[in-house]
Amino acid sequence: MTPKEEFISIFKENITRPGGDKLLHWLEGSDFFIAPASTRFHGNHEGGLVEHSLQVYKCLLGELDTVDLKTRYTNETVAIVGLLHDICKTNFYVKGFRNVKENGVWVQKEVYEIKDNFPIGHAEKSVIMLQNFMKLDADEIYAIRAHMGAFDCAFKGGDQFLNNIFNQCPLALLLHLSDMKATYIYE
């Protein structure tokens, strides 16, 4: 099964709320399944975004088991936050070129560049994009909003929202840990 097929299977099996079908149709018409997860770091290759999304989802399932919280959240909620936390990266990257030196010779190398047509912020954009298709509950919003943890620009600027969210919503902390585990251990 390809990553795209696996993603669609998990999505259809778990995400059944109104608007989910329209969201999946939109994803299939977008670059979600071929987009990279980043320009230079984890998953910076074609299909990296869907691979990362699947890995975060799988890590989240494991984290929920580890702390015995699996029954606190529905399969749908876990699938939404795990698979779709980075939906903001859809239609976000374009291919470009950069000059790099290889063996003492300058060569032109194809790279991914950012083209942000909706510069509202990473996690905020994911929440907004998802809510254009379906209603999210508070825990889903908290988890997606806080999934960047201390890498979030608002936190770096001194905002204390993370402490409040992590204290109120264990799912948010577990999604953040799953994102970090996927990024730094598995990818």
What are these regions (language model features)?
Residues 1-35:
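Non-catalytic interface/linker regions that flank or bridge core catalytic/transmembrane domains
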Residues 39-41, 51, 68-187:
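Divalent metal-dependent catalytic cores for phosphoryl transfer on phosphate-bearing substrates
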Residues 10, 14, 35-36, 60, ...:
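Generic signature of intrinsically disordered, low-complexity segments enriched in small/polar residues
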Residues 8, 12, 57, 61, ...:
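Amphipathic alpha-helical segments within well-ordered protein domains
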Residues 21-23, 44-46, 106-110:
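Generic detector of short, locally flexible boundary/turn motifs and exposed helical patches
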Residues 26-74:
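A glycine-rich, hydrophobic loop/mini-helix early in the fold
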